[in-house]
Amino acid sequence: MEKERADILVVRQGLADSREKAKRFIMAGQIYTEKALRVDKPGEKLPVTTQLTLKGEDVPYVSRGGFKLVKAMESFDIDFTEKKVLDIGSSTGGFTDVALQNGASMSYALDVGTNQLDWKLRSDDRVVVMEQTNFRYSKPEDFVAGQPDIATIDVSFISLDLILPPLRPILKSDGQVAALVKPQFEAGKDKVGKKGIVRDKKVHRDVIEHTMQTAIGLGYDVSGLTYSPITGGTGNIEFLMLLTNTEGEPGQIDSAIDIDAVIEEAHSVFH
């Protein structure tokens, strides 16, 4: 079984935003495995599948995945106040929870699966549960509580190439999209390494550029780019992209976006 340093796993799982902070948590005796065993050394090698917890941490959302949207919200200045949100790939509802806690008036929790949404959200009148729904076939009339102002996307085993086209007529004009770009599901099979992990910076760049070109070709503007503060389940670096649903075609890419700088920073944090 593949193993990795404990401090690196702490960062990958979003418990710390730097290796130095991860080391401090470990040395302070605050990091534990799922078997309630304390991790004592930053350099200790643990199976990459080990789920770690930070003692004393209070996660304010129904899942740690919510921290991905918090990063997007803060990096891209997304304002959820009184907005209608479409959460594509809602799973347990981390993104929906973040949106509602930050002022959203309602959220469509849409997922192809079933019985995943946390009960707190399932029983919330502001949440429209749309389970067993393949977004590829969604239409504007499916969203009976009103047209979404903001969409969030966190999907697996499917490319954004198949999600962005049907979203365009569903989302309000000038609506924002916070999309998680997952190289392991966007790159060709020959570009994905062992255990489904993409480590090559060039592949990361190719995936980001492809997603940007797809977006502007559909009429979205690419307005922002950063990396996710939490890696994918197998340790994959993922990226957050902000799109704007403009009326012009093709869209434009913000000249301030520096793809290489974002990739370099992500690799310095997670590898």
Task: Describe the residue ranges of each PLM region.
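A short glycine-rich, Lys/Arg-flanked "PGG" loop and its adjoining helix->strand segment in the class I
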Residues: D161-A178
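Conserved class I S-adenosyl-L-methionine
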Residues: F80-S91
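Glycine-rich helix-loop-beta junction characteristic of Rossmann-like nucleotide cofactor-binding loops
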Residues: L15, E74-T81, V144-A145
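Conserved SAM-binding loop of SAM-dependent methyltransferases across substrates and taxa
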Residues: T92-A104
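Flexible, glycine-/basic-rich loop-and-beta segments that form/coincide
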Residues: I237-H271
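Short, glycine-/aromatic-enriched active-site segment of Class I SAM-dependent methyltransferases
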Residues: P183-R199
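S-adenosyl-L-methionine
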Residues: Y108-L162
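S4-like RNA-binding module at protein N-termini
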Residues: E4, E20-I78
